[in-house]
UniProtKB/Swiss-Prot annotation:
Keyword Signal: no
Gene Ontology biological process terms in this record: threonyl-tRNA aminoacylation
Record text on cofactor binding: Binds 1 zinc ion per subunit.
Gene of this entry: thrS
Record organism: Leifsonia xyli subsp. xyli (strain CTCB07)
Name of the protein: Threonine--tRNA ligase
Binding-site residues, Zn(2+): 384, 435, 562
Single GO molecular function: metal ion binding
Function: Catalyzes the attachment of threonine to tRNA(Thr) in a two-step reaction: L-threonine is first activated by ATP to form Thr-AMP and then transferred to the acceptor end of tRNA(Thr). Also edits incorrectly charged L-seryl-tRNA(Thr).
Subunit structure as annotated in this protein's UniProt entry: Homodimer.
Its EC number(s): 6.1.1.3
Amino acid sequence: MPRIPSPPQAGLRARAARAFRLELTHPFRHDLLGVDQVADGFEFFTDRSVVAMRVNGELKDLATIVTTTDVVEPVTIYSPDGLAILRHSTAHVLAQAVQTVNPEAKLGIGPPIADGFYYDFDVAEPFTPEDLKALDKEMSRIQRAGQRFVRRVVTDEEARAELAGEPYKLELIGLKGSDAESAEVGGEESVEVGSGELTIYDNVDPKTGETIWKDLCRGPHLPNTRMIGNGWALTRVAAAYWRGSEKNPQLQRIYGTAWPSKDELRAYQTRMEEAAKRDHRKLGVELDLFSFPDEIGSGLAVFHPKGGIIRKEIEDYMRDRLIANGYEMVNTPHITKGHLFETSQHLNWYREGMFPPMHLDEERDAEGNVTRQGQDYYLKPMNCPMHNLIFRSRGRSYRELPLRLSEFGTVYRYEKSGTLSGLTRVRGLTQDDAHIYVTEEQIRDEFARQLQFVLETLRGYGLTDFYLELSTKDPEKYVGSDESWETATETLREVAVESGLELVDDPGGAAFYGPKISVQARDAIGRTWQLSTVQLDFNQPELFELEYNAADGTRKQPAMIHRALLGSIERFFAILLEHHAGAFPVWLAPTQVVGIPVADAYGPFLDDVIAQLRARGVRAEVDHSDDRMQKKIRTHTKAKVPFQLIVGEEDASAGTVSFRFRDGTQLNGVAVDEAIERIVASIQTHELVDTAWPA
C-alpha cells in the first residue's frame, strides 16, 4: 500500500460506500466522541459510518492508539463487522437498562447474532410486554445520553472484585483461568472472555466522567451510545439455559435487532412479517403437509400424504439426476456397533451430538452370569463410515475411480430440545448423502464436477441466487497433517473461484476431517440458507485403510469427497416451502389440477378431462362436493393448487375448459387437448405458474 502523505491539513473521510486501507505515517488516537483530532500534523477525519477499525487485521475500538508501522482499515457500520459491533453495543445498553429498572437482575451473556442480538438475565419473574416497554424507554434515554464505551484491561483478581455480585460472569472468568489457551469458553460466550487479556467495558457519562455501568466484554464497541441511533427494537422474550445446558439454571433471554437507520429497521420488520407468513411450521399445518406428534417425540417429523408426495418428488428428481451423473445408489442400516464410530473418530468429536448407546447382544445364564459379552450400538449420525465399508468390501482398481456412492440415508442427531425448530432442526433427518472416492490426480476435476452438479440440480428446484462459502481448518479441532489441509484448502479455493460465484471465507468452520465449500442460497425474500456442502477428506480413507490398485501396480490410498446436495430432505423441504410460500412449482404441487363444475351436470365432462390428465401422470381430481362453486374456488386457492379447470355450459358444448390460476387470473375457452399439453409441459419443465399464460 502506498503511504498517505502528511501535510499539515491532510485529511481522509471514510464513506460507507467506499472501503479503503491506509498506512499511517504518524501515530494518532481517535477520540471517543468522534471529533477530529490532530497528532503530529496528521488529521484523521471520520463520520458516523466508521464505527471501528482493523489494525493489522484485528478489530479495534476507534480509541485504540496506533503507530507509524500499523496498517489501518476503517470498519463502517454497514459492513458485517460494523453491524455486529452496533448490535453488541445495543445489547450492552439493554443490559444496563435491565439493571437500572431491576437492580437485582444478574447478567448472563449478550452477543450479536444474525440480524440482531440477545442478552440473558437471571430474574425472579419472567419479563412481560409491559417490562419491554419500560426497557425500551430506558434504553432510549441511555442512547440519547451519549455514554462512552471505555475499554479497560483487568487482571482476573480485579475482574472478580468488580463483578463480585455477578455469579455468571465469575463463572466465565473461572473458566478462563490463568491460562487463556486452555479456556473452556466457546461460541457466543467468547464475546465475554477468550484467548488474550481480560477486559471490562465501562459506560461513562460524557459530562462527568463517572462510570454508570460496566460489563465483562472483549469488544470492540461503538465510541458512544448516541451512535446506536434509533434503528433498534426489542423483539421477543424466551427462556434459555445458561451456557446451553439443561443442567444449568434457566434464564430469561431478551432478543432485539439493530440497524444503522430507522428505515433499515422498518425494512427488516417488513421482511420478518413476510417471513412469518411463509413460516413452514405454519404452512405445514395449513396445507396438511406434516406434523410433530407428541407421542413420537420432539424433533421427529411425520409427513402426511400431501407432504409425502412433495417429498417423493424431491427425492425422485434427485435420484434421477444422480443416476444420470454416474452415481451408484446404496443403502445402509440405521444402527451400528460403536466400534465403527471409534474407527471413524465420530465418537471422539461428535459423541455429545449422538443418541446414547444401546447395549445389546449380552447373554446370561439362569443364575444371571454373563455368558456372552454385550456391546454398544448407536443410531448413526453419519453415513460415511458405512460407505467406507462398502468401498473396502472388495479389491478396487484405479479403473473404478471415481467411485460415486449415494444414499438417501436417515441419520440421528441428539439436538438439544431448545434448538429444535420445525423441519429445519430435527433429530431424525434424511440426507442425500454421497461419497466419491478418487485418485489424487482426479481431485480437482471431480470437485469441479460436483460443484457444477450441485448448482444445476438446485436450479431445477427453482433456486437461482447463490454464493459460496469456504470453511477452513479449526486449529483446535482437526485431524490429519497441516500439509494435507493446506493442499485441500487451496484446491477447493481454486475450484470455487473458477465457478464465478462470490466466495466468502469461513475461518475455522470446517469439520474435523477436511475443508469444505458450502453453497449458500438466497430465497424469495432475501434470506440466506446453507444448502449443499462439498467436502474433501484425506483422513477417513486413512482411518479405514482404504486402498486401490494403481496403474503402476502399487497400492494407493484414495481421497474422499463428501457431498450432501440438499443438506437434509427435511430442511430442504422447509426451505422450498418458505421460498415458494407454499405455492410450489407445478411439478412439486401435491394436487396439480382440480376440476370445478359450474353445476353437477358438467361433472361427467370434467371427469373425462381429469382421467386424460391422470393417464399422463398428472395429479388431478374433480371436486364433486356439495359446496357452491365460489367456495370450491376459495378452498382450492387457499390450498395453492396451480390449476383450477372450471367448466360450464359454454365450455362443455365447445369441448373447452377455463383455467383459473393462483393469482385469480383466468384463461377461458382453451381446447381440452391444448389444456392437457400445456399442463403436462409445465410439469416437465418445472415451471412455476402463478398467473395466466399469454393468450
